[in-house]
Amino acid sequence: MAGAKEIRSKIASIKSTQKITSAMEKVAVSKMRKAQQRMAAGRPYAERIRQVIGHLAKANPEYRHSFMVERDVKRVGYIVVTSDRGLCGGLNINLFKALLKSLKEWRDQKVEADFCVVGTKGASFFRSNGGNVVAAISKLGEEPSINDLIGSVKVVLDAYAEGRIDRLYLVSNKFVNTMTQKPEVQQLLPLAASDAQGVQKGLWDYVYEPDAQQLLDALLVRYIESQVYQSVVENSACEQAARMIAMKNATDNAGDLIKDLQLVYNKARQAAITQEISEIVGGAAAV
């Protein structure tokens, strides 16, 4: 029964792992729902800022902030949003593939890049593969704050304002639904025309304090910060959804493996019993 003992031990080990993956799946479901709530709560804020920026830009057409002006691209910047932990399927790998595809398009034009990295997995990726990382932040926790991101985002915004980079992209995962998370490379700067114009019909002519141009300068920075924050929150929802699916698959696979091993165990046990009976019968016949 030595073979049967080993199989029984494997079954016990897999059952133990199955309990862990099942528990992790349930935790991921709970965390995903909380992240979805934060994601939904942040959208109206970013949308309202975009509308105010559009109104200010329309009211002051002669003023063009550097964040709104196209220029020749000599160097680009990427804000890359990744997870802090693994066990979330191909979430980060697919994101890196999208990043590398965009990066290749620019490098084919002899344009190099700087990176601002959010998340431990992103930091590990650039340590292994190289890249000029100018800012990095990780371990934001389950409830990130926009204040945690301001310092890192300021580094790349200053680089853009000073002309050290000429275009800024945000690379993150978009939450399509529980089963689908899609990596996306979104241009942050210069602002696309739709972002800069906002909603232009049926607006009152407001009086702004302080000066409208000063307010526009501050809001543009705040808008970019809110976009990055929203992406971090959305990426967190994507991470938990991907982990939930990965843990469910692991739990199901463990169940299938237990069934297969149970069948092998039963066959081994039956073979051992048959052998013992044969030995007893053989011994009796010899007597």
UniProtKB/Swiss-Prot annotation:
CDD domains: F1-ATPase_gamma (cd12151). Keywords: ATP synthesis, Cell inner membrane, Cell membrane, CF(1), Hydrogen ion transport, Ion transport, Membrane, Transport. It is found in: Cell inner membrane. InterPro entries: ATP_synth_F1_ATPase_gsu (IPR035968), ATP_synth_F1_gsu (IPR000131), ATP_synth_F1_gsu_CS (IPR023632). PROSITE patterns: ATPASE_GAMMA. The keyword Phosphoprotein does not apply. One of its GO terms (biological process) is proton motive force-driven plasma membrane ATP synthesis. One of its GO terms (cellular component) is plasma membrane. It is a peripheral membrane protein. Belongs to the ATPase gamma chain family. This is ATP synthase gamma chain.
